[in-house]
Amino acid sequence: MRKWEHYEHTADIGVRGYGSTLEEAFEAVALGLFDVMVNVKKVEPKECREVEVEEEDLEALLYSFLEELLVLHDMEGLVFGDVKVRIEKTENGYKLKAKACGEVLNPEKHEPKEEVKAITYHDMKIEKLPDGRWMAQFVPDL
């Protein structure tokens, strides 16, 4: 089961995602990112985009994945309310394939909150917790 939460971080807000798998934690942190911007519960899966990134480590993979989603938001005005992720180990690191579904931002419907300017490595962590769940977190630049 994936879930996310926002946490206090000095003048910013952190995004932390949990999942029973690494993929679910990445999905949850992506949804948490968009929930900083809008009410994701009101986003319908009208349009889908596929994202594919490859990186040497999990932190770089998370960064690149979230950056691709933010670029889609900035370029096409999309907000996402559903994300499915597949991660595979490769010879050189990791490969992520994702399908993100949502719709064009409608201020009356989606209740805009904060504007995320950029993805950062600030306070980024990805770890398997003692209870077996995965956690991924970072602090976006608002």
Curated annotation (Swiss-Prot):
Where does this protein hold Ca(2+)? 12, 141
Q: Name one GO biological process term.
A: tRNA splicing, via endonucleolytic cleavage and ligation
- Which top-rank group of organisms is this from? Archaea
Q: InterPro entries this protein is in? A: Archease, Archease_arc, Archease_dom, Archease_dom_sf
Q: Name one GO molecular function term.
A: calcium ion binding
Does the keyword section mention Metal-binding? yes
**SUPFAM superfamilies to which the protein is assigned, alphabetical:** MTH1598-like
**Keywords, sorted A to Z:** Calcium, Metal-binding, tRNA processing
Name any one Pfam family assigned in the record: Archease
List, alphabetically, the Gene3D superfamilies matched. Answer: Archease domain
Return the PANTHER family for the record.
ARCHEASE (PTHR12682), PROTEIN ARCHEASE (PTHR12682:SF11)
The record describes the protein's role as: Activates the tRNA-splicing ligase complex by facilitating the enzymatic turnover of catalytic subunit RtcB. Acts by promoting the guanylylation of RtcB, a key intermediate step in tRNA ligation. Can also alter the NTP specificity of RtcB such that ATP, dGTP or ITP is used efficiently.
What protein family is recorded?
Answer: Belongs to the archease family.
The protein's name:
Protein archease
